[in-house]
Swiss-Prot record:
UniProt KW Cytoplasm keyword: yes
Residues that span the membrane, as ranges: none
Main location: cytoplasm
InterPro entries listed in its UniProt record: Chaperonin_Cpn60_CS, Cpn60/GroEL, Cpn60/GroEL/TCP-1, GroEL-like_apical_dom_sf, GROEL-like_equatorial_sf, TCP-1-like_intermed_sf
Name of protein: Chaperonin GroEL
Record-level GO BP terms: protein refolding
């Protein structure tokens, strides 16, 4: 085991604060509408240009072990805020730096770090309650566009694209971001339920131009096993043929004699059918079949519940207005399912999302909700170069997270004003002793910091602007993009409540840990010995005789 350096007290804290400052100073230049870019070196290819705080934080690794510890703790603030709220990483970093900086002064003056922490926690709890009080729900598409634009560094076109996508697929719908093929941003919307399984045979295609199978007003048969024997299918096929409507079969697989018979009937025009494999695997496949059943008003034919394929009737089949099947995807549009049953299923899946432990499970469950509740929208990001594409795509993803957060918990005035107004709830607080009061003061000072940094990045005098905003009331603040004072909500400068709240809570949590640190243990730097002198070159002995 390698030897360790153990550093105590002020010496340990001072080094860690240096690391905090290095990382925070690199991140905070990106804050606000006039924030600057940071250029990140890549091991191959061109550098990446970004205004995303968490992207900058993730790149920073310091040589000094103790400094690096401080930097990594603040990096944790940024990444945790990004994970929870999807945005607000720079604000969280600025708040953490301020709490650490102010707190260290009090610790150096001999105050009790644990009491300081208690004071900080008390102040943050009061501020969070105040933020929840002033928060108002997002009701209009315009507000969603404004939140998206602010998060995308005042790019209104990105905000409008996201608002348009949310209008199309609903607030529960899935919105994904992909690389576009042109210079302009594009929005593609898939209505209804889409799953990633295509036709089992190209002979089902009835629209050669688009190379897809189109079924109008079809029945949908859902079966959770393989179908290879046509005898099992015959009774239900005869009933569908009498009804004179097309049929989609969704099963684990359709093969052999069964598939061949379906294809022959299709070619001869006796019965219009198509077959696709069921989406997902294992338990997820069963759940998705059940989703399709609820969406189409049908029943999954499963032996577990005593249903067999040969006994299936028309009342077991689902129905839809239209189904389109491509080589890789199937889209069910306007299923005949009962609205109350669909709503119940969505609630059930949401409860599973709350309990899900892995991000992958949560994402898959969220997709299922979207497929039942709305649809899928794809924002294709257009740009002239790959570097610009990456930077813009990161901003679109940030804006998307911010709008989701705004829908979830509502909005507050942006530009650092919400935190500044929440100070009113803190200034009335008193701790149990002088040290706790000092902790409350630390948070009071820190909550001015985001506005100060926004103003500094805009090239204005921070103290003057902060003093003027404090004099105002409610939504009155400074719009750094235009250099004007006024009602920020009317100007469209909005922040999601969840982002502001999460940034403050995470910053205080990590900063408090740092203030209460009294010892740091790091691996000692290895002393590399100088390389040995190379040996003499052989065969040079006879050189003297040549002189």
């Amino acid at each position: 085991m390698a030897a360790k350096d153990v550093v105590f007290g002020d010496a340990a804290r001072a080094k860690m604060v240096e690391g905090v400052n290095i990382l925070a100073n690199a991140v905070k230049v990106t804050l606000g509408p006039k924030g600057r870019n940071v250029v990140l070196e890549r091991s191959f290819g061109g550098p990446t240009v970004t205004k995303d705080g968490v992207s900058v934080a993730k790149e920073i690794e310091l040589k000094d072990k103790l400094q690096n510890m401080g930097a990594q703790m603040v990096k944790e603030v940024a990444s945790k805020t990004s994970d929870n709220a999807g945005d607000g990483t720079t604000t969280a970093t600025v708040l953490a730096q301020s709490i650490v900086r102010e707190g260290m002064k009090f610790v150096a003056a001999g105050m009790n770090p644990m009491d300081l922490k208690r004071g900080i926690d008390k102040a943050v709890a009061a501020a969070v309650e105040e933020l929840k009080k002033v928060s108002k729900p997002t009701t209009t598409s315009k507000e969603i566009a404004q939140v998206g634009a602010i998060s995308a560094n005042s790019d209104t076109s990105i905000g409008e694209r996201i608002a348009e996508a949310m209008d199309k697929v609903g607030k529960e719908g899935v919105i994904t971001v992909e690389d576009g093929k042109s210079l302009a941003d594009e929005l593609e919307v898939v209505e209804g339920m889409q799953f990633d399984r295509g036709y089992l045979s190209p002979y089902f295609i009835n629209n050669p131009e688009k190379q897809v199978v189109q079924l109008d007003n079809p029945f949908v048969l859902l079966f959770d096993k393989k179908i290879s024997n046509i005898r099992d299918l015959l009774p239900v096929l005869e009933q569908v043929a009498k009804a004179g409507r097309p049929l989609l079969i969704v099963a684990e697989d359709v093969e052999g004699e069964a598939l061949a018979t379906l294809v022959v009937n299709n070619i001869r025009g006796i019965l219009k059918t198509a077959a696709v494999k069921a989406p997902g695997f294992g338990d997820r496949r069963k759940a998705m079949l059940e989703d399709i059943a609820i969406l189409t008003g049908g029943t999954v034919i499963a032996e577990e519940i005593g249903l067999t394929l040969e006994k299936a009737g028309l009342n077991d089949l689902g129905q839809a207005k239209r189904i389109e099947i491509g080589k890789e995807n199937t889209i069910i549009i306007d299923g005949a399912g009962d609205a109350a049953a669909i709503e119940g299923r969505v609630k059930q899946i949401r409860a599973q999302i709350e309990e899900a432990t892995s991000d992958y499970d949560r994402e898959k469950l969220q997709e299922r909700v979207a497929k039942l509740a709305g649809g899928v929208a794809v924002i294709k990001v257009g740009a002239a170069t790959e570097v610009e594409m990456k930077e813009k795509k990161a901003r679109v993803e940030d804006a998307l997270h911010a709008t989701r957060a705004a829908v979830e918990e509502g909005i507050v005035p942006g530009g650092g004003v919400a935190l500044l107004r929440a100070r009113a709830a803190i200034s009335a607080l008193t701790g149990e002793n002088a040290d706790q009061n000092a902790g409350i003061k630390i948070v009071l000072r820190a909550m001015e910091e985001p506005l100060r940094q926004i103003v500094l990045n805009a090239g204005e005098e921070a103290s003057v602007v902060v003093a003027k905003v404090i004099e105002g009331k409610g939504n009155y603040g400074y719009n750094a993009a235009s250099g004007e004072y006024g009602d920020l909500v009317e100007m469209g400068v909005l922040d999601p409540t969840k982002v502001t709240r999460t940034a403050l809570q995470n910053a205080a949590s990590v900063a408090s840990l740092m203030l209460t640190t009294d010892c740091a243990v790091a691996e000692s730097p290895k002393e590399e010995s100088a390389p040995a002198m190379p040996g003499g070159m052989g065969g040079m002995g006879g050189m003297e005789g040549m002189m």
